[in-house]
A protein has these predicted regions:
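Conserved phosphate/ATP/ADP-binding segment of small-molecule kinases
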Residues: 174-177, 183-235
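Anion (oxyanion) recognition and catalysis
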Residues: 69, 95, 172-173, 229
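Hydrophobic beta-strand scaffold residues
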Residues: 75, 101, 178-179, 235
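A glycine-rich helix N-cap at a beta->alpha junction
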Residues: 93-110
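Conserved phosphate-binding/catalytic loop of the ribokinase/pfkB sugar-kinase fold
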Residues: 102-105, 115-158
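Glycine-rich phosphate/adenosyl-contacting loop at the front of the ribokinase-like
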Residues: 1-78
Length: 235
């Protein structure tokens, strides 16, 4: 099934540190998994200059679209990036992976998830969302969607109800299947009311793991599967 994804556009960066000084400079606790701000992200990027690193386009939906392209499906990805080299890299990497990029662009630096690897091997993760979650419904056009049979949306975007609801409405109007990934049980707990509303109305395909299914239904996994299967075509 030809599928277009909608998710947070984040570049995954792995950086091998010569020492742990940068962690103290940036204000991240060693071994932590933290959200970081733009000032911290700029400090990290300056510290990367000349150090061994690797990077890849990331974000759960983007990774899924890349996998689908490898399997031969037509795949696209909608996201929002900044006007910097990281955003340029993200766009070019998707093209090389045969995933069509549909990016809204803004001034500033793009989002990224940076894994800082200390000399002793311990990993510290800092995620800077940047412009990724600020994409608006108006930046997602019917022209983008009409070339596909399905849209795949990550649950992390539920923080933007207008974006998710409006995009689902556009997709259904055009005859697309709507697939939703619940993403995390904390997301389910935070947006249970919204999920109760949009899943029966718009969602055809629902992805969840055991903990997410239990959080959504309030039932044990084997019972949760039955309930979910009654609400959507595929779960």
């Amino acid at each position: 099934m030809n599928t277009i994804g909608l998710g947070n556009a984040l570049v995954d960066v792995l950086l091998k540190l010569e020492n742990d000084d940068v962690l103290a400079e940036v204000g991240i606790q060693k071994g932590a998994m933290d959200m970081i701000n733009q000032e911290q992200m700029i400090k990290i990027r300056k510290s990367q200059e000349g150090l061994e690193r690797s990077q890849a386009p990331g974000g759960s939906v983007c990774n899924t679209m890349r996998a689908m392209a490898i399997l031969g499906a037509k795949a696209g990805f909608i996201g929002k990036i900044g006007s910097d080299s990281v955003g340029e890299y993200y766009e070019e990497a998707l093209k090389k992976a045969n995933v069509s990029p549909y990016f809204a662009k803004t001034d500033g630096i793009s989002g990224s998830c940076t894994v800082l690897i200390s000399p002793d091997g311990e990993r510290t993760m800092g995620t800077f969302l940047g412009p990724a979650p600020t994409i608006t419904p108006d930046e997602i056009t019917e022209e983008m969607l009409s070339a596909y049979q399905c849209i795949y949306i990550e649950g992390y975007l539920l923080v933007n109800e207008e974006l998710v609801r409006t995009t689902m409405q556009k997709a259904k109007k055009l005859g697309l299947k709507v697939a939703l990934d619940l993403s995390n049980f904390n997301i389910v707990n935070a947006f249970r009311g919204l999920l109760d509303d949009i899943i029966p109305e718009y969602v055809d395909i629902l992805f969840s793991n055991e903990s997410e299914a239990e959080a959504f239904t309030g039932l044990k996994a084997h019972e949760a599967v039955k309930v979910l299967s009654e609400q959507v075509e595929i779960s």
